[in-house]
Regions:
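Bacterial N-terminal signal peptides that target proteins for export
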Residues: 1-8
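Bacterial Sec-dependent N-terminal signal peptides
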Residues: 11-35
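Non-catalytic accessory regions used for complex assembly or targeting
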Residues: 28-36, 40, 116, 255-262
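Short N-terminal edge-element motif at the start of the domain
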Residues: 31, 41-44, 57-123
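Phosphate/adenylate-binding glycine loop and adjacent helical scaffold
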Residues: 32-33, 45-53
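Intrinsically disordered, flexible peripheral segments
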Residues: 42-44, 53-75, 134-138, 142-270
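Beta-strand-enriched cores of mature, soluble protein domains
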Residues: 108-113, 125-130, 244-246
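Histidine-centered catalytic micro-motifs
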Residues: 118-136
């Protein structure tokens, strides 16, 4: 065998050794599998609503909640109004996703008669995806009415003059920035403030002492009962602590008879 041929054979053998591992598999990095972390669940109107997070390694792909249609269908038509409102559920987001999603917990409200302003006086659900702890939420008393210096494009933070009966119950004549104790202020799209007919769905942004603290898909019962998937535009929220989702979709599964409320496309945490 010539020296030149021997060199070629050695080169090919060595190169082949770098291309395969001992078990014959490629040495290229394998794709990290996608997993779903389970959060908390609660019985709401005879059905279980649960939070979850879809992860790929340490990266958050989606955060959301599973909402069975039974929890919508069985919502009572008449409820006694209390102040401040009490959530039908308070559910933690999975630990693994909190920091990288900017979301800590979900508080869900059933508004049988709706609430201010005009277009929101229709039966609907409020899904508050909060970026602060439950203790911080419960400490909100609407005494410091500092408004944020900047709002998302196309949003407003209106004040609402209350009728006498509501004013007596709430203890104020005007809801500054639509501030609700144990919730915060509510910034809403200006098109929904000006709307004459009842809303079907809206993406609300919440504030406390000038800082953003939640994003809220506000969705009418009528829309949810259509059992159809839909999207809502996510605003860019200045001052939000942590990552922000740039997409929201309510995806209906006819076979499972449930919605998945999905936040996705998260930015890097601030």
């Amino acid at each position: 065998m010539s020296i030149g041929l021997r060199a070629v054979i050695i080169t090919l053998v060595v190169a082949g050794g770098f291309g395969c591992s001992k078990d014959g598999s490629s040495s290229e990095t394998k794709e990290v599998s996608i997993t779903e972390a389970k959060g908390a669940c609660a019985d709401i109107h005879k059905s279980q609503v649960c939070t979850w997070a879809k992860m790929q390694g340490e990266n958050v792909l989606e955060v959301g909640a599973t909402v069975p249609i039974g929890s919508i269908e069985n919502a009572p038509a008449d409820t006694t109004m209390v102040w401040p409102p009490v959530p039908v559920a308070a559910l933690d987001i999975p630990d693994v996703a909190r920091q990288k999603s900017g979301m800590t917990n979900l508080t869900m409200f059933w508004e049988a008669q709706g609430h201010p302003t005009g277009a929101f006086f229709t039966p609907h659900f409020d899904f508050h995806f909060n970026g602060i702890s439950s203790a911080e939420i419960n400490a909100i008393d609407c005494k410091d009415l500092t408004k944020p210096t900047a709002l998302p494009a196309g949003y407003a933070l209106p004040d609402f003059d209350l009728p006498p009966d509501a004013s007596k119950m709430m203890g104020v004549k005007t809801m500054i920035g639509l501030c609700v104790p144990k919730m915060g202020m509510h910034a809403v799209p200006t098109v929904d403030i000006e709307r004459k007919e009842p809303i079907t769905a809206s993406m609300v942004v919440g504030y406390a002492i000038g800082k953003p603290i939640f994003v809220e898909p506000m969705i009418s019962k009528a829309l949810l009962m259509k059992k159809e998937s839909f999207d809502l535009t996510m605003p860019a929220v200045s001052g939000w602590t942590g990552a922000q989702a740039s997409k929201f979709r309510a995806e209906y599964d006819a076979q499972k008879q449930e919605y998945r409320l999905i936040f996705s496309d998260f930015s890097a945490a601030n």
